[in-house]
Amino acid sequence: MAMAAAAAVASQGLLATSSQQQKKSSAKLICNAATFFSGKRLLWVKSCNNGAVGLRASGVRCEAQAIEREAVKADAGNSREEDAFSGLKQVCAVLGTQWGDEGKGKLVDILAQRFDVVARCQGGANAGHTIYNDKGEKFALHLVPSGILNEKTTCVVGNGVVIHLPGFFKEIDNLESKGVNTNGRLLVSDRAHLLFNLHQEVDGLREAELAGQMIGTTKRGIGPCYASKAIRNGIRVSDLRHLDTFREKLDILYRDAAARFKDFEYSSDEVNAEMEKYVKYAERLEPYIVDTVDYVNAAIAEGKRILIEGGQATMLDIDFGTYPFVTSSNPSVGGICTGLGVAPNRLGDIVGVAKAYTSRVGSGPYPTELFGEEGDELRKAGFEWGTTTGRPRRCGWLDIVALNFVCTINGFTAINLTKLDVLSGLPEVKLGIAYKTPSGEKLRAFPADLSILEQVEVEYEILEGWKEDITKVRSYDELPAAAQRYVERIEELIGLPCQYIGVGPGRDALIVKQ
């Protein structure tokens, strides 16, 4: 029905190209495509580039409305952002589309002002989010959800997260030293698994064992902790309430590590010292511990708005990423259901966050990677050093093949394109639009076989660059024409709107594209 409605609009000539006179008095379309809704987004309809027509959808009925330039300017800024954000469903998720470091934290921080609960569903301290408050103060978070800066938001660390308590408390102390109150606003799942220092030590031993085939782990102990969970000798947050059996479970972890790695040595004194720490940790963590599955689902039933913050990104997903150069959890949409206990039919909007180019920390295939001076320039322009590790990130052009793959898996309803400003000043920009084998065969989909992925030749589409500094731009129609063409070409190739466009690190450096 939505398609028929759109066709009816088009047949009436409402999407016709404007005359030269109309161009002077009318605004360039805020978006070169219109989105129609009937409960969910069903259709992405291209419209002309220079028309002065906006489309509104109510159910499956569409209405065309001329948009005058002055009216667009009057509606720019906060009112336009409010309209875009208020349209989000009750349960909304923000997920990474690449290899992490896309800038998810910033969008979550902005959206959190409009949601009652912000929840993390997977990963651990290997996921780093850098956000800024209204004063411009920088916060690097690893376990605490990004919504913590919004004082009316409750933050949830779900059952799918692995928690290193020393690091968790350090984040809390840092937040409170800067005036951020976490009391009653930060909840930790009683089902979440605890990550111990021994997991971090084992992580390093495992990497050393692999020698030349290192995965490039952050050495934060994430993989070993999830391994403990999988073989069912992990220790959960709820175990802190049973200290009489805690020591025995801790002993098992140490014995298993020593049996697996000859270089892992420990003494009973070391285990005793660790036990003493966790007796204190148990007391401090107790006020934060709740059954988050019950809490989140009760909040949904009460009509509260839930925002889910994914850590890392789909190209690092243990099932769908470039295995084995991946993380140990599911940073894709499935991880929301298993990591929070939220049913699939409860999920509404799912926003995928993608850089206007790509970056990756650590080892693994990376088809569009730039080497030498080109890669160095992009790294410097984007300040591409890992939030968690401090390691320089590998940088390259936007990979449309990989992006289409993750869009299919996650069912994104919109894209947040970040760091568009980093590409300013380049004479040309490229999009990796297809993979070919050395024999010239074009691949239909993103390959699972790394031996194929490592040999693919990328087919690029070259677009004109732009010289202008766009960090002060807050309206889409004020972007340089070349920047708009770049955004719109991405939309055409992935079949989704780039509804949010980042043009700088600050909270306000965001264009909401209607």
Curated annotation (Swiss-Prot):
The catalytic residues are 101, 129
Transit peptide feature, positions = 1-56
* Enzymatic reactions: IMP + L-aspartate + GTP = N(6)-(1,2-dicarboxyethyl)-AMP + GDP + phosphate + 2 H(+)
Q: Does the keyword Transit peptide apply?
A: yes
Reported EC number(s) for this entry are 6.3.4.4
Primary localization = plastid
Query: What residue ranges carry the coiled-coil annotation?
Result: none
Q: Name one GO cellular component term.
A: cytoplasm
Q: How is the cofactor bound?
A: Binds 1 Mg(2+) ion per subunit.
Tell me the SMART domains matching this sequence.
Answer: Adenylsucc_synt
Q: Give the binding site residues for Mg(2+).
A: 101, 128
Question: Where in the cell is the protein located?
Answer: Plastid, Chloroplast
- Is Metal-binding a UniProt keyword of this protein? yes
Residues binding IMP, per UniProt: 101-104, 126-129, 218, 232, 312, 327, 391
Q: Which GO terms describe its biological process?
A: 'de novo' AMP biosynthetic process; IMP metabolic process
Metabolic or biological pathway: Purine metabolism; AMP biosynthesis via de novo pathway; AMP from IMP: step 1/2
Q: Name one Pfam family in it.
A: Adenylsucc_synt
Q: Which InterPro entries does the protein's record reference?
A: Adenylosuccin_syn_GTP-bd, Adenylosuccin_syn_Lys_AS, Adenylosuccinate_synth_dom1, Adenylosuccinate_synth_dom2, Adenylosuccinate_synth_dom3, Adenylosuccinate_synthetase, P-loop_NTPase
**Subunit comment for this entry?**
Homodimer.
Protein family (similarity comment): Belongs to the adenylosuccinate synthetase family.
Q: What is this protein called?
A: Adenylosuccinate synthetase 2, chloroplastic
Record the organism. Physcomitrium patens
UniProt lists the gene as: PURA2
